[in-house]
Amino acid sequence: MRQCQRSPIGIFDSGVGGLTVLRELYRRLPNESILYFADTARLPYGTRSAGEILQFVREIMDWMTSQQVKMVIMACNTSSALALEAIRDEFALPVLGVILPGARAAVQKGKRIGVIATPATAASNAYRQAIEEIDSTAQVWQVGCPDFVPLIEQNRLYEPYTKEVAKQYLNPLLQVNIDTLVYGCTHYRHLEPLFRQILPPSISLVDPAQYVVSAAEKELELLGLKSTLPCLPTRFCVSGNPETFANLSRQWLGYIPRVDKVYLPVKIRSSMSLEVLE
């Protein structure tokens, strides 16, 4: 059991969005070792088809299991919306998504709920369905935001253009008088200072990262896998440029991490695993 407790939690996202989940894990579960994977070679996920997303996630999960993780958190709303159920059926370890924890938190905050998300997540109606299943009286408005992830990954958070884009996306939600805004993409927490400049203070902001970590903690306790041992250093792996990810993530981690390059072969078969390049 001690060996299982010592095994890392796997987190994956298309890029730096999952760092919001990572920071919450550091805060809530300081004894847990973590393996973070960013599929930066294929971001953004939000404009991909459902078939592509499922293919990508299967490849990542094959590699994650080869790294002997004890749990995987899909720190990516698009993957959670389009691949979570299929992946849970195919892999034996616990796999958590961010949508249901975010939906549960949203209905506790208000009844007029806006969701900003990638186009793929918005089109899936995953948040609308989850929220309405929990509270049929809640009203949900969704806006697809294709430009946010590229702007964040390009580190253009504080440019006037980014603020104008944010206003364009948020204005339809302000017009219907939402009382709650859900970050339907883990990247969007990085834009929170900008959102606070645009939104009235009466609107509650829901970051699903906070709530998926709470769910992960409960799951680990239930399975007897919560670590009571000191953690190992976090491993960072990417499919794209390690230096780009390291430099971009510095502002949220507070240090420049060591990042390993991981090669994702472009294969049709979903069973292909990933290989770490030496």
UniProtKB/Swiss-Prot annotation:
PROSITE patterns: ASP_GLU_RACEMASE_1, ASP_GLU_RACEMASE_2. Keywords: Cell shape, Cell wall biogenesis/degradation, Isomerase, Peptidoglycan synthesis. Substrate binds at residues 13-14, 45-46, 77-78, 186-187. One of its GO terms (biological process) is regulation of cell shape. InterPro entries: Asp/Glu/hydantoin_racemase, Asp/Glu_race, Asp/Glu_racemase_AS_1, Asp/Glu_racemase_AS_2, Glu_race. Provides the (R)-glutamate required for cell wall biosynthesis. This is Glutamate racemase. The lineage of its organism: Bacteria, Bacillati, Cyanobacteriota, Cyanophyceae, Oscillatoriophycideae.
